[in-house]
Structure formats: structure tokens, C-alpha cells
A protein has these predicted regions:
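Conserved catalytic cores of phosphodiester-cleaving nucleases, focusing on short active-site segments
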Residues: 4-16, 33
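Flexible loop/turn segments at secondary-structure boundaries
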Residues: 14-18, 53-56
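Long, contiguous hydrophobic alpha-helical segments, chiefly transmembrane helices and signal peptides
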Residues: 8-10, 26, 30, 47
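Nucleic-acid nuclease catalytic cores
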Residues: 23-24, 34-59
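Active-site beta-strand termini and strand-to-loop segments that position acidic
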Residues: 1
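Active-site-adjacent loop/helix micro-motif of nuclease/hydrolase catalytic cores
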Residues: 16-29
Length: 62
């Protein structure tokens, strides 16, 4: 079993109000491109977007 796998996708936003849309795009990219395929066991998916130093994070599982 071991530790879970973790997949990150990072995006930047030009405006603070775009953070939620960009984090959704990051998360969708992980799923659409199947970055977690072939990983065994539990896989944690992390979409992150940044505007300057302000983060927005979405976490899910495969």
C-alpha cells in the first residue's frame, strides 16, 4: 500500500478575481490529461493557482 501518490498542477492568474477559474482549469487538466493514470493505490490531486503570492487550492482524489 504505502504512501498515496500526489499530482500537482500549477497555474498563474493575471487578476485576483481569476483565481477560482484558473484553479478549476488546473484541476480539469489533471483529469483530462490523465496525469494520475498508471499510479497505484490512492492518488491525491491538487490544483493550485496563484495571483502574486495569493494561493487558491483545490484538492480531490482519483
Amino acid at each position: 500500500r504505502g504512501e498515496p501518490g500526489i499530482v500537482f498542477e500549477l497555474k498563474t492568474a493575471d487578476r485576483k478575481r481569476d483565481l477560482n477559474a484558473r484553479v478549476d482549469e488546473a484541476f480539469a487538466q489533471i483529469r483530462d490529461r490523465g496525469y494520475y493514470e498508471g499510479m497505484e493505490g490512492r492518488v491525491i490531486l491538487v490544483g493550485m493557482a496563484f495571483w502574486k503570492k495569493v494561493p487558491c487550492v483545490r484538492i480531490g482524489s482519483a
